From Swiss-Prot:
It is found in: Cell inner membrane. Its EC number is 2.7.8.13. This is Phospho-N-acetylmuramoyl-pentapeptide-transferase. It catalyses: UDP-N-acetyl-alpha-D-muramoyl-L-alanyl-gamma-D-glutamyl-meso-2,6-diaminopimeloyl-D-alanyl-D-alanine + di-trans,octa-cis-undecaprenyl phosphate = di-trans,octa-cis-undecaprenyl diphospho-N-acetyl-alpha-D-muramoyl-L-alanyl-D-glutamyl-meso-2,6-diaminopimeloyl-D-alanyl-D-alanine + UMP.
Length: 360
């Protein structure tokens, strides 16, 4: 919204700053961060008062988690609130990719909110049925995939970009939209599975979003794409503002989610963050790079898939418990140790993913 202040500029005054995506990204970061600090504690107090016993704890989960009983959930409301407010304030409203990513974020947040509400109100860990969540998630992803494809240049529609190879695209034809749907749905659920320890999901999500934001800015500029030999997607640069806001919102939330957590993000936050990452990857045509920068989420999801399939086939388990962060808990690792080491892994993967822009 503040972009329209450029209409007051004569080209050499302070209003001209609002033309620059990087300036507005900085503003979005600070706005979301301040939002988190201002409204975090009041929101936690409201959630604690409304929820009473807080998020239900699984009976078959790690023993150390029983001490977390009574901690309120739905803290994702703080993330989403800061993210939406900041993005709407600093991003251009005429950019279709910004609206697409915002739509996915809010829609998945609503699914997560319904799930969290069902869990808290019934005081069990079931929530909304898995089939219903999946169906709603697919519908959202279909809309987002078609939305992005419609706004991509004709030469990029239905194309899958290969990292490392110079401006190499594979035409998936009619398979592209189903592929994009899988990226968004898979990303949302992978982040959701990762959110099992205090601070575990939020930092890797922030790191992945920041990396994708840099990529979005790069592929949205002709000069950068010519230098890097990557495809040009006009309009994606504005997504940097969204990712900067996400980083600020994430820091604001982490202030209260750091061990021992005063609030959990719940499915409200994890589904929203995962959906946003998938939507950004689809918008920028960097779906495969998401698998690298979000590699931690991929591993967490794969650990569950492997565990379930292997157990059905043999009656035995590969991991002591899935997702894999619970496996390390069962092995005796302290929760902060797991969280910090997974953060480090996420940072390394993000650097590798970012390097794919240059390594051609």
């Amino acid at each position: 919204m503040l972009y329209w202040l450029t209409a007051l500029s004569d080209g050499g005054d302070v209003w001209n700053l609002f033309r620059y995506i990087t300036f507005r990204a900085g503003g979005a970061f600070m706005t979301a961060l301040i939002f988190g600090f201002l409204f975090g504690r009041p929101l936690i107090n409201v959630l604690r008062r409304k929820q009473g016993k807080g998020q239900p704890i699984r009976d078959d989960g790690p023993e150390g988690h029983f001490s977390k009983a009574g901690t309120p959930t739905m803290g994702g409301l703080l993330i989403v609130g800061a993210l939406l407010t900041s993005t709407l304030l600093w991003a251009r409203w005429d950019n279709p990719f910004v609206w697409m990513v915002l739509f996915v974020t809010l829609a998945y947040a609503l699914i997560g909110f319904a799930d969290d509400y069902a869990k808290v109100s019934k005081q069990n860990t079931k929530g909304v049925s898995g089939k219903m969540r999946l169906a709603l998630g697919v519908i959202i992803a279909v809309i987002a995939a078609l939305w992005a494809s419609y706004n991509h240049p004709a030469e990029l529609q239905n194309q899958l970009a290969l990292p490392v190879f110079k401006d190499t695209l594979i035409n998936l034809g009619l398979l592209y939209v189903p592929f994009a749907i899988c990226v968004i749905v898979g990303s949302a659920n992978a982040v959701n599975l990762t959110d099992g320890l205090d601070g575990l999901a939020i930092m890797p999500a922030m790191i992945a979003a920041s990396t994708l934001g840099v990529i979005a800015y790069a592929v949205g500029r002709v000069d950068f794409t010519e230098y890097l030999d990557v495809h040009y997607v006009p309009g994606t640069g504005e997504i940097l503002i969204f990712t900067a806001a996400l980083f600020g919102a994430g820091l604001g939330f982490l202030w209260y989610n750091a061990p021992p957590a005063a609030v959990f993000m719940g499915d409200t936050g994890s589904l929203a963050l995962g959906g946003a990452l998938g939507a950004i990857a689809v918008a920028t045509k960097h779906e495969l790079v998401l698998a690298i920068v979000g590699g931690l989420f991929v591993v967490e999801a794969l650990s569950v898939i492997i565990q379930v399939l292997y157990f059905k086939r043999t009656g035995k388990r590969v991991f002591l418990m899935a997702p894999i962060h619970h496996h390390y808990e069962k092995k005796g690792w302290a929760e902060p140790t797991i969280v910090i080491r997974f953060w480090i892994i996420s940072l390394i993967l993000a650097m590798i993913g970012l390097a794919t822009l240059k390594v051609r």
